[in-house]
């Protein structure tokens, strides 16, 4: 979040999408409702209750609504059709003598109303042309604009999880696929068990499909602590490769007190002495692969440093040069000379 990947995306010829302009339709890419009904049901379930308060009866009724909506309109189905099915079921003779069932139907109607066409977030989830296209080779999604609307952010992020997982499994295994989630604690903070289940499944099985997930956070505690969500622990536990970079000294000391067996004394000491990359021109990190550990330094050339930079002044410099008519390549080139002239000249 924060446009940190905008320059990289443009340099690589990727597609850059802002969260404010993202558009979804849960029914958009379905070809077989028998294979996809539960996936759509899970998406609507998380949207309706991000904290996972729907029970098996709620979900059974919601699955009926999803199937009925698809059978009536196929890819033209919308969340409105799901809500209309629930309303008709609530008013039907079938449940006239079942106040508990009718109560659950009414609860879902209220919870999903905000995502209908005329609801608060309807514009995001009822599009005839969803933003994510299957022909794009690189897509960067910037969700910073949704931070002040946590319910919408949860709905969008889980919709993305489902879309990405679907792309992982339904594209040729000869095609390499990579999903990178930066500031991943926002994703991993979900309390809904479904999110953890999806992440656990994805991290365990994507390698069979020549895919990989990379999840980045500022603090190891986001992944591995008593406060970490089930989604965070699933990501950590199912990752064969772990890269530990510079940590906050205070937070890392606290973590080692709580989990004294996670790192050996030498490892704790070395990690604690990692310097800031901007001061030493390289990043130090500990690489853990299964039971093996090794130490590394990452050096990046000045042009790449300029392209990857998310510092405020660097970002503004590139944007100003773009306004002056320079291409993204020319703007990054000038930034590299501005920041590292002698190194560029050598």
Regions found by a protein language model. Give the residues of each.
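P-loop NTPase motor domains
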Residues: 1-2, 6-211, 276-280, 289, ...
């Amino acid at each position: 979040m924060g446009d940190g990947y905008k320059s990289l995306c443009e340099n690589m010829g990727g597609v850059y999408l802002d969260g404010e302009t993202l558009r979804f339709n849960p029914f958009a890419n379905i070809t077989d409702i028998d294979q996809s009904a539960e996936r759509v049901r899970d998406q609507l379930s998380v949207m309706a209750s991000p904290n996972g308060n729907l029970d098996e009866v709620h979900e059974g009724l919601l699955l009926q609504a999803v199937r009925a909506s698809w059978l009536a309109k196929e890819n033209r189905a919308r969340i409105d059709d799901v809500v209309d099915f629930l309303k008709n079921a609530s008013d039907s003779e079938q449940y006239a003598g079942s106040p508990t069932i009718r109560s659950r139907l009414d609860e879902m109607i209220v919870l999903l109303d905000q995502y209908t066409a005329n609801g608060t977030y309807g514009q995001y989830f009822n599009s005839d042309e969803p933003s994510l296209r299957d022909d794009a080779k690189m897509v960067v999604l910037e969700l910073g604009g949704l931070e002040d609307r946590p319910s919408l952010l949860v709905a969008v992020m889980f919709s993305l999880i489902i879309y990405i997982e679907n792309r992982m499994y339904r594209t040729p295994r000869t095609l390499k696929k990579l999903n990178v989630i930066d500031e991943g604690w926002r994703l991993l903070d979900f309390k809904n068990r479904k999110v953890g289940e999806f992440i656990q499944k994805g991290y365990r099985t994507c390698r069979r499909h020549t895919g990989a997930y990379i999840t980045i956070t500022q603090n190891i505690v986001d992944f591995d602590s008593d406060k970490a969500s089930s989604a965070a622990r699933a990501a950590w536990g199912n990752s064969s490769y772990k890269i530990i970079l510079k940590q906050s000294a205070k937070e890392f000391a606290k973590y080692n007190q709580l989990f004294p067996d996670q790192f050996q004394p030498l490892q704790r000491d070395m990690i604690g002495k990692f310097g800031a990359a901007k001061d030493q021109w390289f990043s130090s990190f500990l690489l853990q692969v299964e039971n093996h550990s090794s130490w590394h330094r990452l050096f990046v050339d000045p042009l790449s440093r300029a392209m990857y930079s998310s510092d405020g002044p660097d970002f503004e410099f590139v944007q100003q040069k773009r306004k002056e008519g320079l291409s993204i390549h020319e703007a990054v080139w000038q930034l590299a000379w501005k920041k590292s002239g002698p190194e560029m000249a050598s």
